[in-house]
Amino acid sequence: VPSMEGPFDYPYIFKKKVDQFGANTHIIHGEKEEKKLAALLKSPDYFAQEIIRGNTEYATHIIFKQGKILHSLNIKYIFHLEMGIKGKDESITRICHCPYLEIFSAILKSIGFEGVCCFNYKVRNNIPYIIEINPRFGGSLSRYFSVIV
């Protein structure tokens, strides 16, 4: 998981805890943005996080039951921007292999999760940095649902 302990070097990401499609996600490049978002920076509904640079992000959709992955689908997002925000910025999507299913399975097993979920993450030095885990049907799965079932 990218660091959530500030203060952060610029740029860093600032987002609403409960959100859809990055609508309330901001990349803070400096003091100018911090001043502009001063009220939100103090809100308990938001949090800041280290940004993982790169124009590629992944969403791994998983159906998990009895401690095992029954089905999974990995979607790769390639943004035109180095630090694109999924849902806000334009990207190209591709279905691809996920080499981190054992890690994701161990996480889900450790919290006793069963059901459908989605891991959103970026990769740095072959290590997945989990941006979020959505314990629900991920929005990006809808157009590929027939592939996973």
What are these regions (language model features)?
Residues 22, 127, 139-143:
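Active-site-proximal flexible loops/turns
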Residues 114-125:
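A short glycine-rich, hydrophobically flanked beta-strand micro-motif that places a catalytic Asp/Glu
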Residues 43-44, 111-113:
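Short secondary-structure junctions
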